[in-house]
Amino acid sequence: MDASPKYTGVRKRKWGKWVAEIRLPNSRDRIWLGSFDSAEKAARAFDAALYCLRGPGARFNFPDNPPEIPGGRSLTPQQIQVVASRFACEEELLPPEQHHPSPPRGDHNTEEEVIISARGEINSGSGGPTLGQVGEDNNNEGNSNDTSSYWPLIWEEENFVGPPNSDHEFGFFTDDSTNLYFPTQQQQQHQLSSDFYYDGACEDDFSHYNINLWNF
């Protein structure tokens, strides 16, 4: 009696090899997936082909370790045959927790330290560009479409993977943005000059009013 496991889409040949094939949806045509030296490899080839035809919600031979094939739903039968055979031979059958390992703790701490360091540089003004300088660079760029040159911190925020709520370390939320704004020297001079001309205009208006007052 054969005690080998039974998998969907898998058959054993008389000479000991395991073969896999899958039928196309709403058709009698089948896709030959190949011949393998173990039932598990043949079953994984079937799962890969099933993913391409039915999607991630199909009933796989290994539901705890389903395949993930980018763009699999748009492949032709010939491409499915190649992808399924390659997936069965290259992908080892691992438990789910080993299939998607978590990042080492040391790297996690290093990334967190980099974020804290970046925030300190923004607050002290000794490191990268302040938000005022970033805005000034934005005006100087004109109609340039390359935003990575004057928005480096936004780029790091979108690409960083870190602990929960790590975005707050960058201070780009509405509640924290006012605490990180530093006016540039040009903006300060512009504000002082605006106040000067405003006071001058007021003095001229009052002096003119006084002259007309005594001019009966």
Swiss-Prot record:
Pfam assignment, any one: AP2
Gene3D superfamilies recorded: AP2/ERF domain
PROSITE patterns, per database record: AP2_ERF (PS51032)
Alphabetically ordered keywords of this record: Activator, DNA-binding, Ethylene signaling pathway, Nucleus, Transcription, Transcription regulation
Low complexity bias spans: 135-145
Molecular function GO terms recorded: DNA binding; DNA-binding transcription factor activity
Transmembrane in keyword set: no
Subcellular location as annotated: Nucleus
DNA-binding region: 6-63
Protein's name in the database: Ethylene-responsive transcription factor ERF016
Function per UniProt: Probably acts as a transcriptional activator. Binds to the GCC-box pathogenesis-related promoter element. May be involved in the regulation of gene expression by stress factors and by components of stress signal transduction pathways.
GO CC terms: nucleus
UniProt region (Disordered), positions on chain: 121-145
Record keyword Nucleus present: yes
Main subcellular localisation: nucleus
Coiled-coil segments on the chain, per record: none
Gene Ontology biological process terms, A to Z: ethylene-activated signaling pathway
Recorded family membership: Belongs to the AP2/ERF transcription factor family. ERF subfamily.
